[in-house]
Amino acid sequence: MITHFRQAIEETLPWLSSFGADPAGGMTRLLYSPEWLETQQQFKKRMAASGLETRFDEVGNLYGRLNGTEYPQEVVLSGSHIDTVVNGGNLDGQFGALAAWLAIDWLKTQYGAPLRTVEVVAMAEEEGSRFPYVFWGSKNIFGLANPDDVRNICDAKGNSFVDAMKACGFTLPNAPLTPRQDIKAFVELHIEQGCVLESNGQSIGVVNAIVGQRRYTVTLNGESNHAGTTPMGYRRDTVYAFSRICHQSVEKAKRMGDPLVLTFGKVEPRPNTVNVVPGKTTFTIDCRHTDAAVLRDFTQQLENDMRAICDEMDIGIDIDLWMDEEPVPMNKELVATLTELCEREKLNYRVMHSGAGHDAQIFAPRVPTCMIFIPSINGISHNPAERTNITDLAEGVKTLALMLYQLAWQK
């Protein structure tokens, strides 16, 4: 089984990765670009040639379907997104779609038609790399995407969402799509995009939750002044205030420990010149945890600490909480089924959370959902150096195939 999947991956992954490949390495496959369209069209042809019924929905999500014999109205869905970040790797997203097809193709050959219908999905978009909108693919599956939210947006080059969509043969709907009611389970295989599995020598991650996230933009207002003539005790230095906030907050996060993570990712001092005390500094905060209450309490304390530091230093502060996403648990029964499968197959696995967002978080509140992680070498992703050992790739497809067998081929 592993040998079969290794060979299948070695043949199909370079093929699929050729669409949108950058000459200097990596991949760029943005929503409704020519590269995106070619990928979806070629993947559609390949799935059709293997015996699956293929179709696009109204926004470009691609499906490959194998009808069930006893419960054709019940769909077990597997796949991931087909788009990439700019100059990304060839595993994030697309390997989940490819793996679903390889797994279903093998199951069809071994066992014939399933009892329940199985479908591969290559979702149109997840990354938000071209337009300021994320999860366009999965949100449309459940009627969660409002066309008005994208009707007037453009990419960095001024191309409108609507025009890009039309160029690929799709038309923006006038209203949200009708939610699918036939999906009974969703299984997403994905690279970990972190270093936990590799660091522990494990090949499979059973995901039990996707972290909640809170993101802020914070602006500190002090006073710009001469760097040579303003004594230290008379300064309202916003970079100094930021440095105190950053140090204190990161130390608290370290004491809190896993799974809490805290990142000060973007810092913009003004006027940002060598001989002026910075009178304004804007920075971002990204905080994540699997427990909503812990995340809320930690960030509330962080806000209080920032205000206290600024009050002490006579610095004005504006705190904008612009993302507040709850943690998303995976389906307990599917997590248990997947864990039992790993035990039975004697796989080297761990139950873990996902520190990144995935399409599965759109599915999980609506249909039973689980995720399978495979290792990322050196924890690198969103990078041309994104890699996973071929044996781990094959182990992931095998695990997915066994899970789909239980869900669709057994009663």
Curated annotation (Swiss-Prot):
It is found in: Cytoplasm. It comes from the Bacteria. Its main location: cytoplasm. It is an enzyme of class 3 (hydrolase). One of its GO terms (biological process) is allantoin assimilation pathway. Induction: By glyoxylate and allantoin under anaerobic conditions. GO terms for cellular component: cytoplasm. Its cofactor is Zn(2+). It catalyses: allantoate + H2O + 2 H(+) = (S)-2-ureidoglycine + NH4(+) + CO2. GO terms for molecular function: allantoate deiminase activity; manganese ion binding; protein homodimerization activity; zinc ion binding. Zn(2+) 1 binds at H81, D92, H190. Pathway: Nitrogen metabolism; (S)-allantoin degradation. Binds 2 Zn(2+) ions per subunit. Also able to bind Mn(2+). Its EC number is 3.5.3.9. Homodimer. Involved in the anaerobic nitrogen utilization via the assimilation of allantoin. Catalyzes specifically the hydrolysis of allantoate to yield CO2, NH3 and S-ureidoglycine, which is unstable and readily undergoes a second deamination by S-ureidoglycine aminohydrolase AllE to yield S-ureidoglycolate and NH3. In vivo, the spontaneous release of S-ureidoglycolate and ammonia from S-ureidoglycine appears to be too slow to sustain an efficient flux of nitrogen. Belongs to the peptidase M20 family. This is Allantoate amidohydrolase. It comes from Escherichia coli (strain K12).
